[in-house]
Amino acid sequence: MQPDIAPNPHSTRPGLSRRFSVAPMMDWTDHHCRYFMRLLSSQALLYTEMVTTGALLHGDRERFLRHDETEHPLALQLGGSTAAGLAACARLAEAAGYDEVNLNVGCPSDRVQNNMIGACLMAHPQLVADCVKAMRDAVGIPVTVKHRIGINGRDSYAELCDFVGTVHDAGCQSFTVHARIAILEGLSPKENRDIPPLRYDVVAQLKTDFPELEIVLNGGIKTLEQCSEHLQTFDGVMLGREAYHNPYLLAQVDQQLFGSVAPVISRHAALESMRPYIAAHIASGGNMHHVTRHMLGLGLGFPGARRFRQLLSVDIHKAENPLLLLDQAAKFLEGH
């Protein structure tokens, strides 16, 4: 089932599909990262870093909403828990051209918990439902939710069903489920991505019990072969850290998961395709490392990978002409 996906008939953008997506990741999925990832896959749904309602309503709005037209299909992830604030931000997202707005109900960080953002909201399903309804009433683009299978103290399957059912009653049709509970005290966000065990079986049961909903699986997925297996059960898969650290995995997403017959871009061609973008960023006063830090994984597993990473990170800061370093790094990928 693919609810809420019809593209604007007057748009040349690819239609929004959640069959494969790259997770919102703080400090990682900025607009430079997304531009690079889009070069590798035309079909993957990309997400922004989480933006809080306070930051968007009272901060540098242009910076938080900035994106390139090539990044579509593109979703804005919001963090917040007030219906009015989330509705206002959803309107801003729609006006800025985003294809979807997603509510974060999965982040376990202490910093966001203190502001009633993220996974702690799983303890308040009706509040989440009220927020979703307000957002849906405010915009015409899809409103989705990303959440865990539970939190400590509220981690039974019955409570998960209560959460999903309540939020579904508010109109949400698509749920991206990180197949771990979140432990809200005593673990860092990084530990919360590793220590709680993965429970794909729980998410599969959720899909069985809510067949009318779009259920996207997130957590621990590392290969496109695993994606294909999970897509026999779930409507979509979302990759996080693996897609960032090994970005060339995205180069075969269109062919393996969407049936594209287009040729797969080479690692070398991907890096070369970024050169004009990087040159423009430098010309506008930016630092090349803002962009190339997201590209270090292109050399993963290659002889000289360490030198490749060094050229695009450490050496940049002392280079008079950083584009020469980019060209040196490209030589490591020639023929690949």
Swiss-Prot record:
Coiled-coil segments: none
Similarity comment: Belongs to the Dus family. DusA subfamily.
Function according to Swiss-Prot or TrEMBL: Catalyzes the synthesis of 5,6-dihydrouridine (D), a modified base found in the D-loop of most tRNAs, via the reduction of the C5-C6 double bond in target uridines. Specifically modifies U20 and U20a in tRNAs.
Domain of life where this protein originates: Bacteria
Transmembrane helix found in the keyword field: no
Residues engaged in binding FMN: 24-26, 77, 146, 178, 218-220, 240-241
Pfam families: Dus (PF01207)
InterPro entries xrefs: Aldolase_TIM (IPR013785), DUS-like_FMN-bd (IPR035587), DUS_fam (IPR001269), DusA (IPR004653), tRNA_hU_synthase_CS (IPR018517)
This protein's UniProt keywords: Flavoprotein, FMN, NADP, Oxidoreductase, RNA-binding, tRNA processing, tRNA-binding
Top-level enzyme category: oxidoreductase
Family annotation (NCBIfam families): PRK11815.1, yjbN
Entry cofactors: FMN
Cystine pairings recorded for this chain: none
Record field: catalytic activity: 5,6-dihydrouridine(20) in tRNA + NADP(+) = uridine(20) in tRNA + NADPH + H(+); 5,6-dihydrouridine(20) in tRNA + NAD(+) = uridine(20) in tRNA + NADH + H(+); 5,6-dihydrouridine(20a) in tRNA + NADP(+) = uridine(20a) in tRNA + NADPH + H(+); 5,6-dihydrouridine(20a) in tRNA + NAD(+) = uridine(20a) in tRNA + NADH + H(+)
HAMAP family tied to this protein: DusA_subfam
Annotated CDD domains: DUS_like_FMN
EC annotation from Swiss-Prot or TrEMBL: 1.3.1.-, 1.3.1.91
Gene Ontology MF, one: tRNA-dihydrouridine20a synthase activity
Name of the protein: tRNA-dihydrouridine(20/20a) synthase
Site (Interacts with tRNA): 104, 190, 193, 306, 309
